């Protein structure tokens, strides 16, 4: 039985069908528009195996989002520096993901905690079609160090399982997408535990799906590697709320992977 390779198939798709485009960073990309991948979270945890994905960074960043943070210091204190290139001299990023998830401003001066409302609505009205969180706040885009790439996500409950679909407007397929897959898969598993459901599917939908010109050699190297089975995720305790998880609550079991492949970040 062959191992499913939706991510590697996406890389091949971009290489085969992409159009050369200029981009904001001046790097240049090979790009396709409108692609989708599906991952069955009831069977495994989709941590890409054809190169190493640093799970600690994935988890710390997600916990940082859930804290509603805008400064990189908390992540740096955990040994994670993935946002440093976009922060100002004080470590600030503006009203990025955490603010929009936890404290979306309202016209009357109040704030909406989208994550808290999501959890409550999943419990009280699981069949709703409004289990949505948006980070794309048009009124505050100009104040963000980087407008949201993974901008909008929706949850769906059926047969005792919680599924998630993410819309990612801009997808750095080599560096960013493996991280994003793992992050939203982890969030789905955490939410499922909190609301008494089992993990279902994670559906990744991409808008501008691209490989940067200076990542081509790395992608070709990665695609020569044989994939391994995905690992399993264990959540070691159930905290009082979605906001009370720590890094020590997560264990990835059986993660067999090829070595890291380094590549420059387009800032």
From Swiss-Prot:
The active site is at residue 149. Its EC number is 2.1.1.45. PROSITE patterns: THYMIDYLATE_SYNTHASE (PS00091). The keyword Methyltransferase applies. Its main location: cytoplasm. The keyword Methyltransferase applies. GO terms for cellular component: cytosol. It holds the Pfam family Thymidylat_synt. It is found in: Cytoplasm. Belongs to the thymidylate synthase family. Bacterial-type ThyA subfamily. This is Thymidylate synthase. It comes from Arthrobacter sp. (strain FB24). The gene is thyA.
């Amino acid at each position: 039985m062959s191992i499913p390779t939706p991510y590697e198939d996406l890389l091949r798709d971009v290489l085969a069908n992409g159009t050369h485009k200029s981009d904001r960073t001046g790097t240049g990309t090979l790009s396709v528009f409108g692609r989708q991948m599906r991952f069955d979270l009831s069977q495994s945890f989709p941590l890409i195996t054809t190169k190493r994905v640093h799970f600690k960074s994935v988890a710390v960043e997600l916990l940082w989002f859930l804290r509603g943070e805008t400064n990189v210091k908390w992540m740096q204190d955990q040994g994670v520096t993935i946002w440093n290139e976009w922060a100002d001299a004080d470590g600030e990023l503006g009203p990025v993901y955490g603010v929009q998830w936890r404290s979306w401003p309202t016209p009357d001066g109040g704030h909406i905690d989208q994550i808290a409302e999501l959890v409550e609505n999943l419990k009280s009205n699981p069949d709703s079609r409004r289990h949505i969180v948006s980070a794309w706040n048009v009124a505050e885009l100009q104040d963000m160090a980087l407008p949201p790439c993974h901008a909008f996500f929706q949850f769906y409950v059926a047969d005792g399982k919680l599924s998630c679909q993410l819309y990612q407007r801009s997808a750095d397929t080599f560096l960013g997408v493996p991280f994003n897959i793992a992050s939203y898969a982890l969030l789905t598993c955490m939410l499922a535990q909190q609301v008494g459901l089992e993990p279902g599917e994670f559906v990744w939908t991409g808008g501008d799906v691209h490989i940067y010109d200076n990542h081509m050699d790395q992608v070709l190297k990665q695609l020569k590697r044989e994939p391994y089975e995905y690992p399993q995720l264990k959540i070691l305790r159930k905290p009082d709320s979605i906001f009370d998880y720590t890094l020590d609550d997560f264990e990835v079991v059986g993660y067999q992977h090829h070595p890291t492949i380094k590549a420059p970040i387009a800032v």
